[in-house]
Amino acid sequence: MTDRSSRLSRALKAYDLRGRVGDDLDDDLLFALGWGTVRTMRARHGTAGVVIGADMRPDSLGFARALARGVAAAGGAPTLLGLCSTDQLYFASGRSGLPGLMVTASHNPSGWNGIKVCGPHAAGISRAGGLDAIADSALDAPPDPAAGDPAAAAEPRPDPDAARELAVGYAETIRAQTGITGLRRPLTVIADCGNGMAGKLLPEVFGTAALAAPAPLDVRGMYTELDGTFPNHPANPLDPANLVDVQAAVVDSGADLGLAFDGDADRCFVIDETGRATSASAIGALVARREIARARAAGEDTPVVLHNLITSRAVPETIRAAGGRPVRTPVGHSGIKQLMAEHRAVFACEHSAHFYFRDFSGADSGMLAACHVIAALAETGGTLSALLADLDPYAGSGEINSTVADPAAALARFRDAARAGTFGAGTVDELDGVTLTGADFWANVRPSNTEPLVRFNCETPDAARTAALTADVLALVRADDRP
């Protein structure tokens, strides 16, 4: 196996490429992937143009340049946007109709990097849908002509006009789709950017005079300096330890809510006025209600909203109550994007705080979701906790991972027990792993795409019952099967 091939095999994941800088990713591999992207996109879509963005990690701009050189070497036309968030890259792809490459490792720690790939119009791409083809084509790429030449490796430069147009167009779209320029009452928001790309977005979206009327929106940023070494805390809001600072700031300042973005700012977690981290399902239900209302106001009878199968049952209940039609999906970025296009869905939400919008080219945007929450809160005279109370009535387990020797055997044990009624009466389906759905509860066990483990989630009406169901299922899944 060649060095390029071995690096690719380590970096290629289910939905993107990700690895350690130096060990897995270097300029040569990024050059080859740019070359492979053009060859693949030209063959599949007849396009040779590619938009390329980079996050704030120390190697990201250099990697973006290597991608651009590879695109050009394959006869393509790269547009290098420079520093941007992942959802800005999706916006640029959607607006231009070109495929996109985003250099980012999202919430991974310092020392990691990667590439998120989208097709024309920000379409999702899976392994089978194009990632494998790009990787295979990359193996045939010539060497990077800039190798060993620092001056050549500093080229090409970002296009300042394209970057400026992106920032303005993105901000205008966020404002127009959420109505944050016309808030009914003043609000104070604490936004923890985690030294990630949200630090660039805050002044672009909120830092204009237009947001001062008719009611002021006071957005106070934390850790806004772009620094891919993450000196304050990892930009991973999935870990509760990384929410402590913004939670304290919200309570100490008496703010109305807090926001916590991940490194590439495509996800945003929301903190209520008490400092409590809100459920991504509750936020998804709130945004779904607003997107359904927008679509119905535009004449759509029964707007479709997608939700993955491990979001709270409050999500489909809210969708139906708002006049929409819920569609349940497997977990996974590229699959949801494809299903959004098939169903012409107005919105989609995942338990992981990925929120997708039809009017944002079907792509996910943490900032767009955050602004929906701000606008929804401003329409009330109350608190965020009160606004979300009826959208978060159930007790969920959260996702619990179990490392097992044989994931397929673990799933089979759960499937057999569920069908036998061991955990209560219900129906069993295999949309993604195995799900048992009862009259007032559900439980799901599904395999990881990349590791020898299974993931468990469940939800019931109360915490005690959820704890009991969790213990029973995990005991079965883990029984006699530890590696």
Across the structure, where does each feature detected by a protein language model lie?
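An N-terminal, well-structured beta->alpha segment
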Residues: 1-67, 73-74, 163-186
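Short glycine-rich phosphate-binding loop at a beta-alpha junction
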Residues: 46-55, 188-190, 303-309, 346
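A short, gly/pro- and small-residue-rich
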Residues: 111-140, 271-287, 360-371, 377
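Gly/Ser/Thr-enriched, mixed-charge loops and adjacent short helices
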Residues: 113-253
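Phosphate-binding and adjacent anionic-ligand microenvironments
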Residues: 257, 297-483
